[in-house]
Design a protein with these regions (language model features):
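Short amphipathic alpha-helical interface segments
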Residues: 151-155, 164-167
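Positively charged
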Residues: 1-152
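Short, well-structured alpha-helical patches and their helix-loop capping segments
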Residues: 122-126, 130, 157-161, 188
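Short, surface-exposed helix-loop/turn micro-motifs enriched in polar/charged residues
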Residues: 25, 62, 66, 148, ...
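Context-gated lysine
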Residues: 6, 32-35, 53, 75, ...
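Extended, charged alpha-helical coiled-coil/arm scaffolds that mediate oligomerization and mechanical coupling
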Residues: 160-280
């Protein structure tokens, strides 16, 4: 894998990682970030995006930034209220930070742009197997996580290039920026495939457990509702028969008797007394 070194204005992102092929927007308010966007717009509209390891850091240094970032093309810049600038970008390719060049106004990075050649090393049958596995697992993921179910997975069936398929799926699944950073840092196709598959399998497992728990809770709630309705219906029937609370009291005695710790002979005498009282109540 060869590399090309280039200098690019740089923005440090907080709580956000953008992947190649992804169209996304972010807001910047730090003076250095705004200046970096302005510098990029005056040149080729390319900007280097690095994600902060600690989103709370106000003045991030190289040590507080992930070394693998994204070269992106700025599509639109909008000035917002409160001195915010909203930037719309499209991810072009992953790149690595080599070093920062001294400048007080904004971050200027010397970046190493990768020229990917790992795809040709994967045998055709292996590549096809990887594509089919991704399609299958993504469809399963959509079944659990999308309102449209399997229908949401149909667009990827038109993609037959492994690298493009990986980027498309990675951009469509709702995962945190740290997980996306793992995908971004997987430079070779094989590494990226393995990271994405691990994420998909984990998300499917979580969704399966979540659905099982939801079904158990639903079943329990429905059972409790059925029992409540039956009890209310039985109460109405007893009232109609003039047996308002007598039968209920007898049942309570029966339940208490079962729980009572006493010799069998004592329980039998109590049982006879309860039965006698119940009969007298219906005379």
């Amino acid at each position: 894998m060869s590399s090309i070194i280039k200098q690019l204005p740089t923005v440090a992102l907080r709580g956000l990682t953008i992947l190649p092929g992804m169209v996304a927007h972010f807001d910047v308010s730090r003076e250095k970030s705004i200046k970096a966007v302005e510098e990029a717009m005056m040149d080729e509209q390319e900007i280097f995006l690095l994600t902060q390891k600690n989103p709370e850091e106000e003045e991030p240094t190289a040590e507080n930034l992930y070394s693998i970032g994204l070269v992106a093309e700025i599509k639109q810049v909008i000035k917002m209220p409160n001195d915010l600038v909203r930037v719309l970008v499209e991810g072009i390719e992953r790149a690595e930070l080599n070093c920062f060049t001294e400048t007080e106004e904004y971050l200027l990075a010397e970046v190493i742009r990768f020229t990917e050649d790992g795809l040709e090393d994967i045998p055709e049958n292996a590549r096809e197997a990887m594509i089919r596995c991704l399609e299958e697992k993504y469809e399963q993921f959509c079944t659990y996580n999308s309102k449209n179910g399997k229908e949401a997975a149909k667009p990827i069936q038109e993609i037959h290039e492994l690298d493009r398929l990986i980027d498309t799926i990675a951009n469509s699944i709702p995962i945190g920026y740290e997980e996306k950073q793992r995908i971004l840092e997987a430079v070779t196709i094989t590494e990226r495939y393995e990271v994405l598959m691990a994420i998909l399998l984990r998300e499917i497992d979580i969704a399966t457990i979540r659905n099982d728990l939801a079904m158990k809770i639903k079943s329990k709630v429905e059972k409790n509702q059925r029992e409540y309705i039956l009890r209310e219906q039985l109460k109405v029937i007893r009232e109609e028969l003039g047996e308002d609370n007598t039968q209920s009291d007898a049942e309570q005695y029966e339940e208490s008797l079962k729980k009572l710790k006493a010799p069998k002979e004592v329980k039998e005498r109590i049982q006879k007394a309860v039965s006698y009282t119940h009969l007298r109540a219906h005379e």
